[in-house]
Structures are given as structure tokens and as C-alpha cells.
Design a protein with these regions (language model features):
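A short, Lys/Arg-rich alpha-helix, primarily the initiator
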Residues: 1-25, 72-92
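Helix-turn-helix DNA-binding elements, focusing on the entry/boundary residues of the two helices
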Residues: 18, 29, 45, 63, ...
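The alpha-helix within a helix-turn-helix
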Residues: 22, 33, 37, 67, ...
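Short alpha-helical DNA-recognition segment
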Residues: 26-49, 93-112
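Acidic (E/D-rich), amphipathic helical modules within compact regulatory domains
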Residues: 29-80
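DNA major-groove recognition helix of helix-turn-helix/homeodomain DNA-binding modules
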Residues: 59-76, 123-141
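Short, charged recognition helix plus adjacent turn
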Residues: 78-101, 142-174, 223-227
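Charged, low-complexity intrinsically disordered regulatory/assembly segments
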Residues: 157-229
Length: 229
């Protein structure tokens, strides 16, 4: 017997936020479902009440229609900041197919990324992913499970030549090449502490105490990037 595919994880949803937004607009559950019907989702008022009490949770399509009916950004109904690709996509009111088309990857590739948290796109596709879903650079590295890869590149930048790490880091952090080159040069320069025979480095010459990635993001944030850090 063929196994059924696992049910999708429910969209993050705050019943209290839904109640608050509806009350703030002075809408009845009947009026909310009328508004949702205008966006192609037809339900009964009991569904709205069930969501608000936490009895059950809306599907992606229902969640987006509810946000539109309540005239609020979907993220405000989540109750927490988006934590994965699916959350960011839903916050942008996009289906998986719409996201894949705008990013420039196949639907299958995008579905795999959401399911596994592993992203295999090149620098251009990674830029499109962050731009389309509204993900900052630091979070983009995190939700695509590329933090270890970035850490490895930064260690190699410290131990070797920063120039050799421009291309691999560009796959992970989609910023203009001149900006990335300058940032990596600054980053490596902070670790090239001059040493003098018979003396310890002065306080001004001490290496940065922050983890490599934290210092990299600090340096990068001082530059202008299309996608915010």
C-alpha cells in the first residue's frame, strides 16, 4: 500500500490576533466569511469562530483569505516572526507555484527547499529568493541551512586569501561583488594582527572577540546592499 504524503504543517496562527483584528474592524463572523468569499474561499461563520477559539487552524489558502478580509498583513496573524521559507512565502501571500515562478526555479525544486530547509540555488536565485520572500540576508542564510557553510568560508578567509572566498560566499550572501570584496578584505584585515618579537599584541591589535559570522554581518551592514542585512 502506498503511503500517503505527510499532511502539511499548519500555518503559524494566533487566535487572539484574529479576534483582535476582527473586533477592531467591528466585523461579525458573517461579514468576515463574506470578505473571504471575495477572495475565492467559501466557509461558514463557525469556521471563523473555531479559528478564534483555537479549536482548529486555517489552511494556507484560508489563512491568506482571512488576512485579506481583515485588511491586515498575514504576518500579523501568525503570532510570531516567520521562521522558515513557508512562513515567509505565506506572509507574502504567495502560493508555492507563484514563488517558484518569481524566483526562477522549478516548482519541484522550491517544494523540496521548503520541505527540507535545504536550498541549492545559485547566487542569482538566492538573491531572487530573498527579494521575492522579503527575507533579510542574515535570516536568508539561516532558513536555507547555510550557516555552517558560511562559517567554513569565513574561517578559510581568515586562514588564507579572502579573494578565494568571494565566489563561494556570493552563493550564500547575494550582495554586489564590490561590496562583498570590500567586506571580506576588511574582515580578514582585522585578523591579521601584527606581532612583534618579544611582545604581546596591544589592546588595539587584539583580534575581534565576536564569532566570525557576527563580525562579518557587522561589517557588511556598514555597506549599502539591495537586500537588508
Amino acid at each position: 500500500m502506498r503511503r500517503r504524503p505527510p499532511a502539511p504543517t499548519p500555518v503559524p496562527f494566533s487566535p487572539a490576533a484574529a479576534r483582535s483584528h476582527r473586533a477592531g474592524l467591528g466585523l461579525t463572523p458573517d461579514q468576515v466569511v463574506e470578505g473571504m468569499a471575495a477572495h475565492g474561499v467559501r466557509l461558514l461563520p463557525m469556521h471563523v469562530l473555531g479559528w478564534e477559539t483555537g479549536e482548529f487552524r486555517p489552511s494556507e489558502e484560508e489563512f491568506i483569505a482571512l488576512a485579506r478580509a481583515l485588511w491586515c498583513p498575514p504576518a500579523q496573524l501568525m503570532g510570531a516572526a516567520p521562521a522558515g521559507l513557508r512562513d515567509f512565502r505565506v506572509a507574502r501571500e504567495l502560493s508555492q507555484d507563484q514563488a517558484a515562478q518569481r524566483i526562477g526555479v522549478t516548482l519541484r525544486a522550491y517544494e523540496h527547499a521548503e520541505l527540507t530547509g535545504k536550498w541549492g540555488g545559485d547566487a542569482g536565485q538566492t538573491y531572487a529568493l530573498g527579494h521575492v520572500l522579503g527575507i533579510g540576508l542574515r535570516m536568508l542564510v539561516r532558513v536555507t541551512n547555510r550557516q555552517e557553510e558560511l562559517d567554513r568560508c569565513l574561517r578559510q578567509c581568515v586562514d588564507g586569501r579572502w579573494q578565494s572566498q568571494v565566489k563561494p560566499v556570493a552563493r550564500l550572501v547575494p550582495v554586489p561583488r564590490p561590496v562583498l570584496e570590500q567586506t571580506l578584505a576588511e574582515f580578514q584585515g582585522e585578523y591579521l594582527v601584527p606581532m612583534h618579537w618579544g611582545s604581546a599584541p596591544s589592546q588595539a591589535e587584539q583580534r575581534p572577540v565576536l564569532p566570525h559570522a557576527e563580525r562579518f554581518w557587522e561589517l557588511l551592514s556598514a555597506h549599502r546592499t539591495d537586500i537588508p542585512v
